[in-house]
Amino acid sequence: MEKPRSIEETPSSEPMEEEEDDDLELFGGYDSFRSYNSSVGSESSSYLEESSEAENEDREAGELPTSPLHLLSPGTPRSLDGSGSEPAVCEMCGIVGTREAFFSKTKRFCSVSCSRSYSSNSKKASILARLQGKPPTKKAKVLHKAAWSAKIGAFLHSQGTGQLADGTPTGQDALVLGFDWGKFLKDHSYKAAPVSCFKHVPLYDQWEDVMKGMKVEVLNSDAVLPSRVYWIASVIQTAGYRVLLRYEGFENDASHDFWCNLGTVDVHPIGWCAINSKILVPPRTIHAKFTDWKGYLMKRLVGSRTLPVDFHIKMVESMKYPFRQGMRLEVVDKSQVSRTRMAVVDTVIGGRLRLLYEDGDSDDDFWCHMWSPLIHPVGWSRRVGHGIKMSERRSDMAHHPTFRKIYCDAVPYLFKKVRAVYTEGGWFEEGMKLEAIDPLNLGNICVATVCKVLLDGYLMICVDGGPSTDGLDWFCYHASSHAIFPATFCQKNDIELTPPKGYEAQTFNWENYLEKTKSKAAPSRLFNMDCPNHGFKVGMKLEAVDLMEPRLICVATVKRVVHRLLSIHFDGWDSEYDQWVDCESPDIYPVGWCELTGYQLQPPVAAEPATPLKAKEATKKKKKQFGKKRKRIPPTKTRPLRQGSKKPLLEDDPQGARKISSEPVPGEIIAVRVKEEHLDVASPDKASSPELPVSVENIKQETDD
């Protein structure tokens, strides 16, 4: 992505391909970027300079993948993991799989459907060429679904409404059901973690170019005209993907400042309106403030910075993900963390995967990021010696749409690679002691033991003094994981260590414990203790996954920073539910990420409606729920009515559970799960609360126990 350019700069121009124009017309608002030039008043220019005409034709034909799969082109021989299997790319849809799993003798397509679609498109292209008097070509104009699906998804996330199969709202439904980050940050003077701190999010490596004082063209919401008009605004403050803007002309008057997500389609570089014949109209409030607006703007714009011309194009490109619905993989069994299970990708949102267990119910799902260490390619468990549950395909799952669309196994290089390890000169041994984040209670760092050494650097770890004696609570960590630490790590960094049962935290001593258990500590040199300059600071706000209920992403705060280790506090919840995560964890996101991707964000407090909402009943199989109930922080003021969905118990715990709590009411299924809180005096007032676009019958009501 280009750096923010000065208004005086004029980049080189070249013709725009017609195919790419058509490609972008899929988006509501993105089509306005055609023939774009970064200089004001220029007549014709291009916003893409990296592709030749021949490359674009090949890409349209499906021969040059435009997604992260560009590392592999169709027919390129390449071994996956030493097994001799060759990967292949479907020439119709772009799905990556193994050649032996592909259809036909040529192995060009993943399924009969893709083969027929390719043939049909080839015929259509040939007929069209003859009608236009063009010479015939062997290349078929086919859809490259790997690229199109990402663009369609981005469009639906920003424009659409609806829910996933598990009841999770998406698109505009998710945004309205969320809360106002801008008001929350401004009212309390909070600071958000910069986008550049999160390596797994779109444009993280270019976001430092978005700076205070930058000029943009945005939709003018203070105008009474029949058509959409725009005006120039300055960036006053940045908070993750969101920026605080002020229309030009208000100068030091902050009364009309407004927040906007830079990922939306109504924010453009300076000059976009001139190129696309859009009208610049000053806000009605200050329309009479100046008589010569043109002269005023020229003085304000000379020498200023603006967004790169390809900003939205790069944003869309960075939101393409290699995982597709129907891919099979291995994932940790949430009911027994010492083993894995086969699962199928059901949904992909912003790189987060909703997985369905092959041998489970249709609602037996698991959420994680595609870079999560909890997922692995098919065959991983057998290769490293990890336990796996042998699944038997359920007959009633054959009718589930995801299982009917299984393409192939996800190839190994789609998963995040782990650091290579060398076992010469001493390695981890069974019985060695260390400190590790408890996978069943992520707010605790416990005394732990290496129970088994697997291949490829993986270790089976158990927490000393755990309730299980048969290895059911063992958990797999890689030797390079930042969730395991050498003995005395907590003591050196003033972190409370959770000792084994029968020991007191205040009096626990590692030397005495090792002598009593006749064991030895794992050498410090075996641990990965490097610490990057991550940029996180105490008090920064972000959006974090509740790993005890990984479907939920919540408003959170960085409570403590210990080298690369972050203590995440969920706003509005007691400190006992804090979680330790690594600074490069894919389970934390910048402010505005949920809005950008269309994922629902759980607010720190629940909205309080004027009337009770009708409970929604569902007739599904009752499931046990595990874990502790969350206690709300006592409010400063009692209220006669409390409304909202409770935080669910540990039903989707990615690492299983250790204690069984009370069961839910039979036949009761939570449709929309948000944390329930009392509204405090600092919560948004009733007038500023967004109106729900969905019927109140679709929201579940619960009462306190």
UniProtKB/Swiss-Prot annotation:
Gene that this sequence comes from: L3MBTL2
Compositional bias (Basic residues): 619-634
Entries under Pfam families matching the protein: MBT (PF02820), zf-FCS_1 (PF21319)
Modified residues (Phosphothreonine): T76
Protein name per UniProt: Lethal(3)malignant brain tumor-like protein 2
Gene Ontology terms describing biological process: ectoderm development; negative regulation of DNA-templated transcription; negative regulation of gene expression; stem cell differentiation; stem cell proliferation
Subunit structure: Part of the E2F6.com-1 complex in G0 phase composed of E2F6, MGA, MAX, TFDP1, CBX3, BAT8, EUHMTASE1, RING1, RNF2, MBLR, BAT8 and YAF2.
Chief localization: nucleus
Modified residues (Phosphoserine): S13, S67, S338, S683, S688, S689
Annotated PROSITE patterns: MBT, ZF_FCS
Organism, scientific name: Homo sapiens
MBT repeats: 179-283, 291-391, 397-500, 508-604
